[in-house]
Amino acid sequence: MNKTNHFKRQALIASVLLAAPLVSHSAIVPDRTRVIFNGNENSITVTLKNGNATLPYLAQAWLEDDKFAKDTRYFTALPPLQRIEPKSDGQVKVQPLPAAASLPQDRESLFYFNVREIPPKSDKPNTLQLALQTRIKFFYRPVAVARQVDKTHPWQTKLTLTYQGDGVIFDNPTPFYLVISNAGSKENETASDFKNLLIA
């Protein structure tokens, strides 16, 4: 993608991960921290787990674009709403729509897969109920890009860091997205105010 990203000099050593760990106290959670949809797939299934031992929940699923706006142009999530019993699983099938063929074929495209849990109505008065939502990254990976995944020559080795002034330029010449989840100094001091960076 040949884009560069700047961050402060304290971020000299980066732990590069493809996705940040999912931290959630929701009852309904997906079975993964990211979704990669390969261009040669007809569908992909995400399992939703209800961790509550006593209550059933409704689970609503949809996709958003990279600006967090609901997007129904390229993919559909079915069923959009389902009931999941206590300590049980549900499944959401994500399928491409015809417009998915118009997505860039030389690089990944970023979307977000969302799940909102809807608790059963409480029979207790004056009870505040929250509909918690989990959002994970959803990457569309075209066939031509998927062919570049080589475990013997990882694409991550092509990433470079270059000092410039009081900062660092992070160059990602690959067609893949990546997340930098942590950074620190040469003395292995983790930057306390470091925020995840998503780099195209």
What are these regions (language model features)?
Residues 2-12:
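Bacterial N-terminal signal peptides that target proteins for export
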Residues 19-24:
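N-terminal signal peptide c-region/cleavage motif recognized by signal peptidases
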Residues 26-49, 148-163:
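Beta-sheet-dominated interaction scaffolds and their linkers
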Residues 48-52, 168-174:
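Asparagine-centered strand-capping/turn motif at beta-strand->loop junctions
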Residues 53-69, 174-190:
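Short acidic, flexible loop segments centered on an aromatic residue
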Residues 64-66, 89, 95-99, 116-118, ...:
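Solvent-exposed coil/turn segments that connect beta secondary-structure elements
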Residues 72-101, 189-200:
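Intrinsically disordered, low-complexity Pro/Gly/Ser/Thr-rich segments with frequent PxxP/GP/PP motifs
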Residues 99-145:
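Terminal connector regions
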